[in-house]
C-alpha cells in the first residue's frame, strides 16, 4: 500500500463530515452540537483527521476559526468527493436527480444579471442551477473555501495560477454615463466642478478601478453622492438623473440605444474590464466537469 493509500485507510468518513461542519460553523462548540457529539470528542476527531493527513487544516489563532491554506485546498477536494459519493448512492437507490445535476455558481452582481441568463439559455438541459449573486471578493472566498463549483468574476492575477483554472469569458468597458434631458443632452459633464459621482463601494473590484482612474485624473472635480456595490442599482440612480456613474457596457446597451443614458466621451476615462470563470484545478464531480467543458465551447452573447 502506498503512502496515499495508507492515509485513506486511516481516515474515517465521519471525520470528513466533521471537517465540513467545522468549516461552516467556524466554532468547535457549535460544530459539535451540529454533529451531535461532545466538544472534546469532536475536537479529538478533527485532530485525528489532521494527524492522518499530516497538515493543520485550521488556523486556531484567529476568531472566528479560519481554514489554513492547506485546509482551503482540502475543503474543495473533500466537498466534491463527498458530493459525488452521495450522488452515486442516491442514483443507486433511485433518488431524485436534482442534487446530482446541480451546478453551484457564485457570481459578481453585474455578471449575474448581464451574463448568466445568456449562459444558462445556451446550455443543454442537463443541469439544475443554484446561483448566488455576491460581491467579487466574497465570490473569491467562496471558491477558495470550496463553497461553489465555480465563480464568475473579473480579472484576478491570483486566480489565473494554480491551484485554480479559468476560462476567459469576454472583454468589456466601463463608460462614464449620465441621464439625458428632454432634448437628449447629458444632464452633467465631467468638466463641471463638483459633479455628483455615483460610485462603487471602495473595496469592490470596479470601485478600485474607478478610484484609480479618478486619482490619475486629478483635474476631475466631483462630490460622491451615492455608493453601492451593485451595477444595476447605480444604473437606476443614474437614470433618475442623480449623477455620473461608470457602468459596464453590457449593462447599459439598451439605455444607450434609447437615449436614456448618454456616454460622456472621454476616451482616456473609459476603463477596460475582463470577465472570467474560475474553478479549483482539482477534479470536480462529473456534472460540474461537464458544465465546465460546455462553458469552454460557449459563445458568449451579451445583450
From Swiss-Prot:
Domain HTH lysR-type: 11-68
Keywords, ordered alphabetically: DNA-binding, Transcription, Transcription regulation
Start-end of DNA-binding region: 28-47
InterPro entries named in the record: LysR_subst-bd (IPR005119), Tscrpt_reg_HTH_LysR (IPR000847), WH-like_DNA-bd_sf (IPR036388), WH_DNA-bd_sf (IPR036390)
A UniProt-annotated Pfam family: LysR_substrate
Recorded GO MF terms: DNA-binding transcription factor activity; identical protein binding; transcription cis-regulatory region binding
GO biological process: regulation of DNA-templated transcription
Annotated knockout phenotype: Controversial. Hypermotility, up-regulation of flagellar genes and up-regulation of flagellar protein FliC. Decreased viability following HOCl stress; no effect on motility was seen in this study.
Induction annotation: Transcription increases throughout growth and is maximal during stationary phase. Is not up-regulated upon exposure to HOCl.
Record's function text: Protects cells from HOCl (hypochlorite) stress but not peroxide or diamide stress. Decreases the intracellular load of reactive oxygen species by up-regulating genes involved in methionine and cysteine biosynthesis and down-regulating Fur-regulated genes involved in iron acquisition. Has also been suggested to down-regulate expression of the flagellar regulon, decreasing motility, but this activity was not confirmed in a second study.
Family label: Belongs to the LysR transcriptional regulatory family.
Assembly: Forms dimers, tetramers and possibly dodecameric complexes; oligomerization may be governed by cellular concentrations. DNA-binding seems to decrease oligomerization.
Protein name: HTH-type transcriptional regulator YjiE
Amino acid at each position: 500500500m502506498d503512502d496515499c493509500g495508507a492515509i485513506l485507510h486511516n481516515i474515517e468518513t465521519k471525520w470528513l463530515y466533521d471537517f465540513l461542519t467545522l468549516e461552516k460553523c467556524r466554532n468547535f462548540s457549535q460544530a459539535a452540537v451540529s454533529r451531535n457529539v461532545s466538544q472534546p470528542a469532536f475536537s479529538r476527531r478533527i485532530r485525528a483527521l489532521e494527524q492522518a493527513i499530516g497538515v493543520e487544516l485550521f488556523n486556531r489563532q484567529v476568531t472566528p476559526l479560519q481554514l489554513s491554506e492547506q485546509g482551503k485546498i482540502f475543503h474543495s477536494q473533500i466537498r466534491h468527493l463527498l458530493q459525488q459519493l452521495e450522488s452515486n448512492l442516491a442514483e443507486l437507490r433511485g433518488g431524485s436527480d436534482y442534487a446530482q445535476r446541480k451546478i453551484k455558481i457564485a457570481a459578481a452582481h453585474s455578471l449575474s444579471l448581464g451574463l448568466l441568463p445568456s449562459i444558462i439559455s445556451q446550455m443543454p438541459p442537463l443541469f439544475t442551477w443554484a446561483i448566488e449573486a455576491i460581491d467579487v471578493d466574497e465570490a473569491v472566498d467562496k471558491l477558495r473555501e470550496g463553497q461553489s463549483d465555480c465563480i464568475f468574476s473579473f480579472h484576478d492575477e491570483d486566480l489565473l495560477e494554480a491551484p485554480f483554472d479559468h476560462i476567459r469569458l469576454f472583454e468589456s468597458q466601463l463608460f462614464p454615463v449620465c441621464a439625458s434631458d428632454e432634448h437628449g443632452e447629458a444632464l452633467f459633464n465631467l468638466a463641471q466642478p463638483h459633479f455628483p459621482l455615483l460610485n462603487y463601494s471602495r473595496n469592490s473590484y470596479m470601485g478600485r478601478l474607478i478610484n484609480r482612474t479618478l486619482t490619475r485624473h486629478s483635474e476631475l472635480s466631483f462630490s460622491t453622492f451615492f455608493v453601492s456595490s451593485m451595477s444595476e442599482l447605480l444604473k437606476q440612480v443614474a437614470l433618475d438623473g442623480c449623477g455620473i456613474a461608470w457602468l459596464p457596457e453590457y449593462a447599459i446597451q439598451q439605455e444607450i440605444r434609447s437615449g436614456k443614458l448618454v456616454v460622456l466621451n472621454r476616451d482616456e476615462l473609459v476603463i477596460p474590464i475582463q470577465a472570467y470563470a474560475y474553478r479549483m484545478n482539482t477534479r470536480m464531480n462529473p456534472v460540474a466537469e461537464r458544465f465546465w467543458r460546455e462553458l469552454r465551447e460557449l459563445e458568449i452573447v451579451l445583450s
